[in-house]
From Swiss-Prot:
Keywords, comma-separated and alphabetical: Heme, Iron, Metal-binding, Oxygen transport, Transport
Binding site residues for heme b: 91
Organism: Glycera dibranchiata (Bloodworm)
Keyword flag Iron: yes
Pfam family, one: Globin
CDD domains noted in UniProt: Mb-like
Family: Belongs to the globin family.
Subunit composition and interactions: Monomer.
MF-aspect GO terms: heme binding; metal ion binding; oxygen binding; oxygen carrier activity
Globin domain span: 2-147
Protein name as annotated: Globin, monomeric component M-IV
Length: 148
């Protein structure tokens, strides 16, 4: 756990392009559309009828906003972990007790694909590695909160 200084810099610099003018909402929608299209059975966990459900865009926007929070705390790993763990704990309270740890790996793949789609060539091999490491830290903290 923990990103190197170089990885933190890459994540922070690419986040500006990933977030874009919509704070990442488009990336979030694309991420969850891909994820739920590939994993139809998981849509019901979120109360969606499928990947085209209108709530998918809203969920994607919320998730990307939380990623933005995590990115803002990359220099303070303890704070980032605490923030993301708290998000996981809150989700238990929302009734999302059926979210499983194994959902996060394919979701991460969909997220990285959507990010790359948005920023194109700026998603270099180093950026992919940095974002994969950041996502591992973020999702690990979320899972910890969900399972607490």
């Amino acid at each position: 756990m923990g990103l190197s200084a170089a990885q933190r810099q890459v994540v922070a610099s690419t986040w500006k392009d990933i977030a874009g003018s919509d704070n990442g909402a488009g990336v979030g929608k694309e991420c969850f559309t891909k994820f739920l299209s590939a994993h139809h059975d998981i849509a019901a966990v979120f109360g969606f009828s499928g990947a085209s459900d209108p709530g998918v865009a809203d969920l994607g926007a919320k998730v990307l906003a939380q990623i933005g929070v995590a990115v803002s705390h990359l220099g303070d790993e303890g704070k980032m972990v605490a923030e993301m763990k708290a998000v996981g704990v809150r989700h238990k309270g929302y009734g999302y007790k059926h979210i499983k740890a194994e959902y996060f790996e394919p979701l991460g793949a969909s997220l990285l694909s959507a990010m790359e789609h948005r920023i194109g060539g700026k998603m270099t091999a180093a950026a992919k590695d940095a974002w994969a490491a950041a996502y591992a830290d973020i999702s690990g903290a979320l899972i910890s909160g969900l399972q607490s």
